[in-house]
Curated annotation (Swiss-Prot):
Residues 289-311 have a biased composition (Low complexity). It comes from Homo sapiens (Human). This is E3 ubiquitin-protein ligase RNF126. A zinc finger (C4-type) spans 13-32. Residues 47-61 have a biased composition (Polar residues). Residues 103-116 have a biased composition (Basic and acidic residues). Pfam families: zf-RING_2 (PF13639), Zn_ribbon_19 (PF14369). The modification N-acetylalanine is found at residue 2. E3 ubiquitin-protein ligase that mediates ubiquitination oF target proteins. Depending on the associated E2 ligase, mediates 'Lys-27'-, 'Lys-29'-, 'Lys-48'- and/or 'Lys-63'-linked polyubiquitination of substrates. Part of a BAG6-dependent quality control process ensuring that proteins of the secretory pathway that are mislocalized to the cytosol are degraded by the proteasome. Probably acts by providing the ubiquitin ligase activity associated with the BAG6 complex and be responsible for ubiquitination of the hydrophobic mislocalized proteins and their targeting to the proteasome. One of its GO terms (biological process) is protein K29-linked ubiquitination. Zn(2+) binds at residues 13, 16, 29, 32. Highly expressed in liver and testis. One of its GO terms (cellular component) is nucleoplasm. The lineage of its organism: Eukaryota, Metazoa, Chordata, Craniata, Vertebrata. The gene is RNF126.
Length: 311
């Protein structure tokens, strides 16, 4: 609470965001009756002729982030949240007093106190963005403006080389649209990756070889061993006609033919109709070894091989 004085002077109410004359002796705002007020520096109270300065900020004295929300929320979908994310506590945007060209030699602390009402005025109206303004005494070449940052953000050309002073932005090394934004961004990337591997398996089997596959009946030995179709997992019935591959694995005709029309390989051991092991050197994946998966696949259904070898 400020000390009582004969002349209270001008104060700034942080609740109303206006300059006021406090109500004595409690030093509260006469508008909202709040005690959250701050005494303004002497040089901002009045001019030499005694006239009170206007509280309406000019275009030059207006904080540079006065309308930052309007700029950010007019960006394309997804960019607004992205732009707010880069403005953290370590990001500073310089502000310049009108007509200032050189350092006036005053203490930096006094300059911060002089500009304190403007910063609080902006902070009371824009509580969402955590922004820090830095006072400078002259405009320097190469310092980015807010309008320039927003424009480059829309154009997608911001890189660490164009704005080297933006530390948090350094994690982006390409167009922001190349990154996954939002809930559907990761799903789109996974779908794209899966589509790239869709046609990397064995090519379709030759139709003549598919038609030439022998059809054999299911025997009592097959039924007794609990033999089932590796595709649909249904048990074979006695006397049922099934297709036999060169690797001696048995399948239902409706299960194996559609598979062979897309992949020239056995679903169990990965051998093609010509006897080649497609799991060891699959087309499109040269240099990748699948020997362990091949051996495990071959040993996964010993009953199928034993049963067919005895047929």
């Amino acid at each position: 609470m400020a000390e009582a004085s004969p002349h209270p002077g001008r104060y700034f109410c942080h609740c109303c965001s206006v300059e006021i004359v406090p109500r004595l002796p409690d030093y509260i705002c006469p508008r909202c009756e709040s005690g959250f007020i701050e005494e303004l520096p002497e040089e901002t109270r009045s001019t030499e002729n005694g006239s009170a300065p206007s509280t309406a900020p000019t275009d030059q004295s207006r904080p540079p982030l006065e309308h930052v929300d309007q700029h950010l929320f007019t960006l394309p979908q997804g960019y607004g949240q992205f732009a707010f994310g880069i403005f953290d506590d370590s990001f500073e945007i310089p502000t310049f007093p009108p007509g200032a060209q050189a350092d006036d030699g005053r203490d930096p602390e006094s300059r911060r106190e002089r500009d304190h009402p403007s910063r609080h005025r902006y902070g009371a109206r824009q509580p969402r963005a955590r922004l820090t303004t830095r006072r400078a005494t002259g405009r320097h070449e190469g310092v980015p403006t807010l309008e320039g940052i927003i424009q480059q953000l829309v154009n997608g050309i911001i890189t660490p080389a164009t704005i080297p002073s933006l530390g948090p932005w350094g994690v982006l090394h390409s167009n922001p649209m190349d990154y996954a934004w939002g809930a559907n961004g990761l799903d789109a990337i996974i779908t794209q990756l899966l589509n790239q591997f869709e046609n990397t398996g064995p090519p379709p089997a030759d139709k003549e070889k598919i038609q030439a596959l022998p059809t054999v009946p299911v025997t009592e030995e097959h039924v007794g061993s609990g033999l089932e179709c590796p595709v649909c997992k249904d048990d074979y019935a006695l006397g049922e006609r099934v297709r036999q591959l060169p690797c001696n694995h048995l399948f239902h005709d409706g299960c194996i033919v559609p598979w062979l029309e897309q992949h020239d390989s056995c679903p169990v051991c990965r051998k093609s109709l010509t006897g080649q092991n497609t799991a060891t050197n699959p087309p499109g994946l040269t240099g990748v070894s699948f020997s362990s998966s091949s051996s495990s696949s071959s040993s996964s259904s010993p009953s199928n091989e034993n049963a067919t070898s005895n047929s």
